[in-house]
Amino acid sequence: MADYTEEDKQKVLAQLSKKTWKIPELAKILKMDKKVVKKIVQDLINEGVAGYWSSGSTTYVATKEYIEELEKKRAEG
């Protein structure tokens, strides 16, 4: 199982609050192992802090707050 520190988790969370990410892109920019990032993201989703968002063709991850902003913009057209 992929282990990570609270600092790693905070780095991921900080990026998720800025934009939507595909996990491989997020791992690359943070210079972290993709499996570790995937585990952190899954834990954040389980905690209700992050979530998945689909553009229609691609699935991304971001914080719940960022996703809500995107959905408002999408609804406004």
From Swiss-Prot:
* Pfam families tied to this protein: DsrD (PF08679)
Disulfide pairings:
none
* InterPro entries tied to this protein: DsrD (IPR014793), WH-like_DNA-bd_sf (IPR036388), WH_DNA-bd_sf (IPR036390)
Q: From which domain of life does this come? A: Archaea
- Stated role: May play an essential role in dissimilatory sulfite reduction.
- Family statement drawn from the similarity comment of this UniProt entry: To D.vulgaris DsvD.
Protein name (record): Protein DsrD
